[in-house]
UniProtKB/Swiss-Prot annotation:
Catalytic activity: 2 glutathione + H2O2 = glutathione disulfide + 2 H2O
GO CC annotations, alphabetized: endoplasmic reticulum; extracellular region
Alphabetical UniProt keywords: Oxidoreductase, Peroxidase, Secreted, Signal
A Pfam family annotated for this UniProt entry: GSHPx
Family: Belongs to the glutathione peroxidase family.
PROSITE patterns with a match to the protein in the record: GLUTATHIONE_PEROXID_1, GLUTATHIONE_PEROXID_2, GLUTATHIONE_PEROXID_3
Name of the coding gene: GPX7
Name of the protein: Glutathione peroxidase 7
PANTHER family named among the record's database cross-references: GLUTATHIONE PEROXIDASE, GLUTATHIONE PEROXIDASE 7
Domain of life: Eukaryota
Organism of derivation: Bos taurus
Stretch forming the signal peptide: 1-18
Compartments where located: Secreted
Length: 186
């Protein structure tokens, strides 16, 4: 009997100590102003992670739609997380300060922006490596969008030809589900 209890306690202890599977919110990134940020701060929220560029043909359409999405859903545990990238057509050549100024001045963006990074290849930021590996979809141009659930798991990935408006119903459904869960928890 004592041996059985000891074995049960060992199994419980082993399960409690088992490493948790890595997710998007386990990473850190430098924000647009140079401060290291743990993406953990977004855990519990729905995130739309996007590689952005200031001089792309998709810039105007996407920045406007992303800001509208942030405005509409931001108060409800949602964030657009923008990562400038200069890998595709050299369409993000400016400094972080200039990128932020452009986005805020031209589109009044209120969503979090991060420092310019690589999103593909050997120098890709670890968070984007995770997005690529778990979704099976690697960015091939600017404005790839990855929908991340409150638990950090990737729900979907879309290329820039898919508009924010087209995926808005999926985003809204995920936010609605989160709101209902939070109400249940009260």
């Amino acid at each position: 009997m004592v041996a059985a209890r000891a074995a049960a306690w060992l199994l419980l202890a082993a399960a409690a100590c088992a490493p948790r599977e890595q997710d998007f919110y386990d990473f850190k990134a430098v924000n647009i102003r140079g401060k290291l940020v743990s993406l953990e701060k977004y855990r519990g929220s729905v995130s739309l992670v996007v590689n952005v560029a200031s001089e792309c043909g998709f810039t105007d359409q996407h920045y406007r739609a992303l800001q509208q999405l942030q405005r509409d859903l931001g108060p409800h545990h949602f964030n657009v997380l923008a990562f400038p990238c200069n890998q595709f057509g050299q369409q993000e050549p400016d400094s972080n300060k200039e990128i932020e100024s452009f986005a805020r001045r031209t589109y009044s963006v209120s969503f979090p922006m991060f420092s310019k990074i690589a999103v593909t290849g050997t120098g890709a930021h670890p968070a984007f490596k995770y997005l690529t590996e778990t979704s099976g979809k690697e960015p091939t141009w600017n404005f790839w969008k990855y929908l991340v659930a409150p638990d950090g798991k990737v729900i979907g990935a879309w290329d820039p030809t898919v508009s924010v408006e087209e995926i808005r119903p999926q985003i809204t459904a995920l936010v609605r589900k989160l709101i209902l869960k939070k109400r249940e928890d009260l």
